[in-house]
Amino acid sequence: MAKAKELESRLQRIEQQLRLFQKVSRFMVRDMSLQEVLQGIVSLVVEFTQCDSCLVYLCDRDDLVLCASNSHHEAQIGRVRLKLNEGLTGWVARERRLLAISREAYKDPRFKYFGELPEDTFEAFLSAPVIARNKVVGVINVQHRQSHQHNGGEMEVLTTLGEQVGCALALARMAPHTVESINHAELVLSSVGVRPRA
């Protein structure tokens, strides 16, 4: 009986993950600004992880710039900047690795205090790189005020969301008329050296 309940619980969590990825994909294909897409993804992450804070930083040359956040940090969007090697977020960008700290994240030697963001009020920290075309283009952070043991599912979800955000950024770089006018079959076939028939 206990095994059946455990399997049922795991199945429910997988269904929740699938619904999350579906909702994120729907944001990505809508005719919305990139800021609206990122804010929508942040809202979904907060709902799914029950975190207290979700932040998306994107690269601007050698800096990471806060570009999306749940309501606690809206005034800081576009204003908070850090170097690619600064703080926990910068470490994730530089190392291209997920980082999970379950408690006292502010005591980690990589932690950097930013006056604009009260990040030292959060105990737990989970962060994943945002990757587009195999390059780090940003970082997505999830923070909890209380200690929180991040499980493998949460880490996997945040990693996948980092990849989805990277895809959204890559797609956003294409002009809308390009998406409509491009011969998609020719584009794909030419990438593997096949010429489409005339």
PLM segments and residue spans:
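Short beta-strand-to-loop transition segments that serve as allosteric relay/switch motifs
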Residues: 72, 139-148
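Signal-transmission linkers at sensory-effector interfaces
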Residues: 1-30, 35, 137, 171-197
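Acidic/proline- and glycine-rich, intrinsically disordered low-complexity segments
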Residues: 75-99
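Allosteric cytosolic regulatory segments
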Residues: 159-166
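Amphipathic alpha-helical coiled-coil segments that mediate homodimerization
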Residues: 20-28, 33-52, 56, 88, ...
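GAF sensory/regulatory domain recognition
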Residues: 43, 53-80, 84, 104-107
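A short, aliphatic-rich beta-strand micro-motif
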Residues: 123-131
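Signal-transducing coupling segments at domain and membrane junctions
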Residues: 74-75, 102-124, 144
